[in-house]
Amino acid sequence: MEKNVCKMTDDSIFLIDIEKILKTKAGKKYKYIPRFVVSYLKHIVHQDELNVFLKDSKNKVGVDFLEACMEFLDAKVEIKGLENLPENGKCTFVSNHPLGGQDGVALGYILGKHYNGNVRYLVNDLLMNLHGLAPLCIPINKTGSQSRDFPKMVEAGFASDNHIIMFPAGLCSRRQGGEIKDLEWKKTFVTKSIETHRDVVPLHFEGRNSDFFYNLANICKALGIKFNIAMLYLADEMLKNRHKTFTLTIGKPIPWQTFDKTKTPAQWAQFVKDVVYKL
């Protein structure tokens, strides 16, 4: 992958600014937000620490940026089934999403390095603000101004010559019935892999967040709170998981022809999810 020689100044890079976000979202009501709330939000998103990293890595993009993320998190990954990575053709890589941080970074780094940067994530468009990550991202947003373009953006991603990395659950794993597993996998990766003749490679990433995170998510669900409050704590969870070694298991590719009419696309998505959790 080519190195980006463009030098960026601190003023031109995205930095986390909780006060600016709250002022934008709350408008005139911002003045009624207690200062301790603002301070707490800065604390749980680790604003100062992450901004130091973003400044230090401002001239790194793509796989180089992901490598810097791995070093910052002191994350190590033991890989099983490396021989299952296809050398020919375009593939869709699908994985469980236990962490919301290290798993995404590690998959992009490992696959990006193996395929010389020819990988793309389908991600929430908010991540496009990260200059270093943006070249590897296909922004998707099912709500707001981009909702009309959502199918078009997904289409463009799968029609490209890059391998696609997806977390079909959309959200990171939750505790369900005492077991930490992904929520329902969406069928998009099945339908688009069929259309573009991409084999599907199942991946399983071993890891978990704290009990606090899972309990909070379940409490919010029980109370009917639609806003994903647990998401605010993902940066905190990511840093709690520093200095750890994770295990990535790569399964054998599933030929796209497998996804025939004997099951619906949603059923095939569940089938692949089951394959992942058996790895």
From Swiss-Prot:
The keyword Transmembrane helix does not apply. It comes from the Bacteria. This is Lyso-glycine lipid O-acyltransferase. Pfam families: Acyltransf_2. Belongs to the O-acyltransferase GlsA family. Its EC number is 2.3.1.-. It comes from Phocaeicola vulgatus (strain ATCC 8482 / DSM 1447 / JCM 5826 / CCUG 4940 / NBRC 14291 / NCTC 11154). Keywords: Acyltransferase, Lipid biosynthesis, Lipid metabolism, Transferase. The lineage of its organism: Bacteria, Pseudomonadati, Bacteroidota, Bacteroidia, Bacteroidales. GO terms for biological process: lipid metabolic process. Pathway: Lipid metabolism. GO terms for molecular function: acyltransferase activity. It catalyses: a lyso-glycine lipid + a fatty acyl-[ACP] = a glycine lipid + holo-[ACP]; N-[(3R)-3-hydroxyhexadecanoyl]-glycine + hexadecanoyl-[ACP] = N-[(3R)-3-(hexadecanoyloxy)hexadecanoyl]-glycine + holo-[ACP]. The gene is glsA. Is involved in the production of glycine lipids (GL), which are phosphorus-free membrane lipids. Catalyzes the second step of GL biosynthesis, i.e. the O-acylation of the hydroxyl group of lyso-glycine lipids, resulting in the production of the mature diacylated glycine lipids.
